[in-house]
């Protein structure tokens, strides 16, 4: 399992590029870009090196944490998966590539694609500072076009990118993502109701083509959650001093909400029997947890303290864990 925090070398390389820039200006740039994303915009608002560095300083730690948590769930479900090649689609500053490099020592080939020149330049500069990623190839252009001529990869990741596409583009791109996948496709989106709906649409579409769910779902049936409920997870990460300064934040940590789906060509070898869908409640009486279960149902289960083995396990559960249900 890998840490949700940026590797020390990546953190230092990113902060070195921020050195000498006005923190106030960088914070304002990051704020404008984030506001554009929240209102439905895309990376087109990132037009310069200064924009890319400011945005990466503020958002790269959180997106890295979400991808890392998703990869951890994948590794739990499929511990023998040892990809040799990665395709990072909508790669931005290379966040998912760095997370995958931490997760899989087997990776030897890294390819990325994105339509934003400023983010590509930053990714290539950061990759040059990282031994594992120095051979990164990074194509510039629309994902849908580039995917048609991309090499297949053992691991394909699309993190925080399908939400930037129109509905028609999204369906075609999701099909193309799976077509380029030899082993596992991981899609990560913001943990909002809209992000969850995009994940569910991709899940349903790709299951229908024969893909297998590795994580987070312990089953391939329809999602049992009913609106206004939705499946999402939370990953806590540490904020660096630069991160806090640019966000104007005092709290030394951040909680990133995300939704994801990991789909495989072959069934996962150790998919857990249940997934914890919210932070469990532990009291003097026992533990209560909301679980998505292998039979395709979701339920709140109670584990009494008197059931010592089951309670000992349940009291250690966290939101997002794959567990053995009582």
Predicted regions located by residue number:
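C-terminal lobe and adjacent flexible extensions of AdoMet/dcAdoMet transferase-like proteins
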Residues: 245-326
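Conserved class I S-adenosyl-L-methionine
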Residues: 82-92
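Class I SAM-dependent methyltransferase Rossmann-like catalytic core
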Residues: 45-69
């Amino acid at each position: 399992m890998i840490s949700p925090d940026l590797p020390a070398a990546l953190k230092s390389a990113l902060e070195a590029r921020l050195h000498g820039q006005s923190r106030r200006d960088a914070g304002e740039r990051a704020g404008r870009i984030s506001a554009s994303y929240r209102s439905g915009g895309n990376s087109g608002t990132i037009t310069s090196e200064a924009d890319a560095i400011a945005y990466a300083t503020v958002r790269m730690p959180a997106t890295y944490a979400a991808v890392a948590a998703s990869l951890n769930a994948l590794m739990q479900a499929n511990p023998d998966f040892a990809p040799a090649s990665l395709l990072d689609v909508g790669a931005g500053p290379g966040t998912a590539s760095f997370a995958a490099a931490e997760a899989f020592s087997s990776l030897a080939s890294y390819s990325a694609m994105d339509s934003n020149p400023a983010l590509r330049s930053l990714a290539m500069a950061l990759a040059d500072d990282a031994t594992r990623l120095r051979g990164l190839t990074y194509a510039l252009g629309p994902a849908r076009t580039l995917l048609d001529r991309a090499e297949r990869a053992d691991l394909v990741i699309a993190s925080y990118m399908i939400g930037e596409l129109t509905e028609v583009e999204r369906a075609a791109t999701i099909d193309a993502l799976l077509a380029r996948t030899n082993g596992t496709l991981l899609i990560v989106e913001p943990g909002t109701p809209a992000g969850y709906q995009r994940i569910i649409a991709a899940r349903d579409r790709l299951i229908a083509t024969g893909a297998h769910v590795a994580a987070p779902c312990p089953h391939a049936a329809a999602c049992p959650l009913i609106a206004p409920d939705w499946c999402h997870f939370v990953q806590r990460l540490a904020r660096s001093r630069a991160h806090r300064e640019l966000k104007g934040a005092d709290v030394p940590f951040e909680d990133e909400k995300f939704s994801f789906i990991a789909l495989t060509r072959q069934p996962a070898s150790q998919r857990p029997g249940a997934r914890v869908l919210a932070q469990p409640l532990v009291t003097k009486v026992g533990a209560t947890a909301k679980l998505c279960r292998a039979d395709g149902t979701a339920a709140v289960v109670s584990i009494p303290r008197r059931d010592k083995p089951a309670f000992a396990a349940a009291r250690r559960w966290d939101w997002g864990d794959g567990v053995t249900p009582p």
